[in-house]
Amino acid sequence: MNSETLKSMLQQGQDNLLLRYGLGQALVNEKRHSEAVEHFQKALEFDPDHSSSWKLLGKVFVELNEYPRAIETYEQGIHVAERCGDLQAAKEMKVFLKRLKKQAV
């Protein structure tokens, strides 16, 4: 779904983890990264253990050249993913974090 459809659902009073995550994803796909931040953050308010939201929020911060926030987000996301047993997400975020730290040097 595109972001406008998802925003319409939000305006109609629907608000939950999957709607916010989906809206964040749609905005990323539309290259509207700064708008996506709030929706991934809201998704994490619904479920702080949602590894995919941490991962995409980190990617958004990278796209926005907000590297310290991206590093912090990936570090938190890795901790959450490992604690919850989401080893694939943890592995991916570790790779992204390693690349980001190399790039920042």
Give a label for each model feature.
Residues 9, 42-43, 77:
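Canonical positions in the second alpha-helix
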